[in-house]
């Protein structure tokens, strides 16, 4: 059975005019009759492309300031007509078949993102006729072709040129899927926006918009199927949010290496987000979602060497992230010293790429340089639901902390405290981090009691022959008892940074004073589960 359908009449009505003129010219060259509306029709006519206004075709003018343009039986009848079935009805009602529709919708997302956008502004940018045409055409994809993305114009023209002016069912079905995805995302954005306005029309005029709508809609696009999930008996895929434009594992370009695994992606995300916290040349090495070595250096090579020194054993098979351009010297040091799963950096020099190319399995990602932090949400799946929260972008500086001990931290201790606090934010709770001279000395992660995390950090440092004496310690949450302070003092810690807020804070501070330690409170917790 021949599933090719010729394109003889097309309706073009787009908000984003990118590529539409060239597309219309190509359709006209193939003998396609063009219908259009408003600004799109004017653009085509002004450039010499023959076009029929939809209002002339329907015999009904655009009304209500353009709110009603294409909602007419001659439009939707022409789109929805089943070829070989509805011809008599079409003839009785003077309806002509419309074989292709190219539509993109009012820019609702851009409108509501603009500063000063009102509810009235948002309402006027809710497209009605566009989504209706899109859904009608997609529903009847057996006979009609829908395009919602300008990137598909060339594809359709190429197929028409190769098939005597026709499109194939395979292409029409693929485009129909894209169309339904498009309208679903569009309606989801509108529902989310309106959901944050509850109760916009209540009697209580004093209310703030909610960040969390009463129903939450999102659309993620599959980037790749994964070999398996967290474990080999689990299937998995990687989906990305195409609306977020920031340097991330989701937007990174893979330059070489084997396909990323589920665990690679999760660990790379942890490493990259951690290294973003630092302005100086920095390196973060992650294993099983926890930093096992973090350091700052005069350059990336020094930062890597120092980060690796923290825990060479755990660094084996780890993920390495940098906050600057990866150079050949640093790349050489990595591949000569250790087995590495993934290397990610804002940029990778050609010389570095040439060095790593000898290790064909090493995955190398280039994510681009990041700017300011982007506001977004974190998701956590629970059985039967989804937890949403602000992404933890909180961070304190020297001017934000409060010294609560008798002894003041020295300038070098305070610098290490700030470094250590940034690392602790990315260690699984209960998190304890030892650091000295902007380098992690020991990391205690994921213990059920805070004192044991402190002990683990000390054990890790001792195992690697690192000197803990006069190091600083960060704790992601307050100490419920003084035992964690005592353990730190026994290990040689000189200064502690922690949120504070325990009912036993006075006892904790007294313990620090007893050991001659300095202690600062941040007033901010960084649990990570």
UniProtKB/Swiss-Prot annotation:
Organism phylogeny: Bacteria, Pseudomonadati, Pseudomonadota, Gammaproteobacteria, Alteromonadales
Pfam families: AICARFT_IMPCHas, MGS
Occurrences of domain MGS-like (ranges): 1-148
One annotated GO molecular function: IMP cyclohydrolase activity
EC number: 2.1.2.3, 3.5.4.10
Organism: Shewanella halifaxensis (strain HAW-EB4)
Claim: Mitochondrion is one of the keywords in the record: no
Family stated for the protein in its record: Belongs to the PurH family.
PROSITE patterns: MGS (PS51855)
BP GO annotations: 'de novo' IMP biosynthetic process
Domain of life: Bacteria
Reactions listed under catalytic activity: (6R)-10-formyltetrahydrofolate + 5-amino-1-(5-phospho-beta-D-ribosyl)imidazole-4-carboxamide = 5-formamido-1-(5-phospho-D-ribosyl)imidazole-4-carboxamide + (6S)-5,6,7,8-tetrahydrofolate; IMP + H2O = 5-formamido-1-(5-phospho-D-ribosyl)imidazole-4-carboxamide
Pathway(s) annotated for this protein in UniProt: Purine metabolism; IMP biosynthesis via de novo pathway; 5-formamido-1-(5-phospho-D-ribosyl)imidazole-4-carboxamide from 5-amino-1-(5-phospho-D-ribosyl)imidazole-4-carboxamide (10-formyl THF route): step 1/1; Purine metabolism; IMP biosynthesis via de novo pathway; IMP from 5-formamido-1-(5-phospho-D-ribosyl)imidazole-4-carboxamide: step 1/1
Keywords assigned by UniProt, alphabetized: Hydrolase, Multifunctional enzyme, Purine biosynthesis, Transferase
SMART domains per UniProt: AICARFT_IMPCHas, MGS
Record note on domains: The IMP cyclohydrolase activity resides in the N-terminal region.
UniProt protein name: Bifunctional purine biosynthesis protein PurH
One GO location term (cellular component): cytosol
């Amino acid at each position: 059975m021949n599933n090719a359908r010729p394109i003889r009449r097309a309706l073009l009505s787009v908000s984003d005019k990118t590529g539409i003129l060239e597309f219309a010219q190509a359709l006209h060259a193939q003998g396609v009759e063009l219908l259009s509306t408003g600004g799109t029709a004017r653009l085509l006519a002004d450039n010499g492309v023959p076009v029929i206004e939809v209002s002339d075709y329907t015999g009904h003018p655009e009304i209500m300031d353009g709110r009603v343009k294409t909602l007419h039986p001659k439009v939707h009848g022409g789109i929805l007509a089943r070829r070989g079935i509805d011809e008599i009805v079409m003839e009785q009602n003077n309806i002509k078949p419309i074989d292709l529709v190219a539509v993109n919708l009012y820019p609702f997302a851009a409108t509501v993102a603009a500063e000063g956008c009102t509810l009235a502004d948002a309402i006027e940018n809710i497209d009605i006729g566009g989504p209706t045409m899109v859904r009608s055409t997609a529903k009847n994809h057996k006979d009609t072709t829908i395009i919602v993305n300008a990137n598909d114009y060339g594809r359709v023209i190429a197929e028409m040129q190769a098939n005597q002016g026709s499109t194939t069912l395979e292409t029409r079905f693929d485009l129909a899927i894209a169309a339904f995805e498009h309208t679903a995302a569009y309606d989801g954005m509108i529902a989310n926006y309106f959901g944050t306005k509850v109760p916009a029309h209540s009697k209580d005029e004093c209310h703030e918009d909610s960040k969390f709508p009463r129903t939450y809609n999102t659309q993620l696009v599959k980037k790749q199927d994964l070999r398996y999930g967290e474990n080999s008996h689990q299937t998995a895929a990687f989906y990305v949010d195409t609306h977020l434009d920031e340097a991330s594992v989701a937007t990174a370009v893979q330059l070489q290496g084997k396909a990323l695994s589920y665990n690679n992606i999760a660990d790379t995300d942890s490493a990259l987000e951690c290294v973003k916290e630092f302005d100086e040349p920095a390196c973060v090495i992650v294993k099983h979602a926890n930093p096992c070595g973090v350091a700052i250096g005069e350059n990336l090579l020094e930062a890597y060497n120092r980060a690796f020194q923290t825990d060479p054993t755990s660094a084996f098979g780890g993920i390495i992230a940098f906050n600057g351009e990866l150079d050949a010297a640093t790349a050489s040091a990595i591949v000569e010293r250790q087995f590495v799963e993934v290397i990610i950096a804002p940029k990778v020099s050609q010389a570095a790429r040439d060095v790593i190319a000898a290790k064909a399995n090493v995955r190398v990602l280039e994510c681009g340089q990041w700017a300011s932090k982007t506001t977004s949400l974190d998701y956590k799946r629970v059985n039967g639901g989804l937890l949403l929260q602000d992404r933890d972008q909180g961070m304190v500086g020297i001017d934000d902390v409060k010294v609560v001990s008798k002894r003041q931290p020295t300038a070098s201790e305070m610098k290490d405290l700030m470094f250590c606090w940034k690392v602790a934010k990315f260690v699984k709770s209960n998190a304890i981090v030892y650091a000295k001279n902007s380098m992690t000395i020991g990391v205690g992660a994921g213990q059920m009691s805070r004192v044991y995390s402190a002990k683990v950090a000390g054990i890790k440092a001792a195992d690697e022959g690192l000197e803990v004496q006069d190091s600083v310690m960060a704790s992601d949450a307050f100490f419920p008892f003084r035992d964690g302070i005592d353990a730190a003092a026994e290990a040689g810690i000189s200064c502690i940074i922690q949120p504070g807020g325990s009912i036993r804070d006075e006892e904790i501070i007294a313990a620090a004073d007893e050991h001659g330690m300095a202690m600062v409170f941040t007033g901010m917790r960084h649990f990570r589960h």
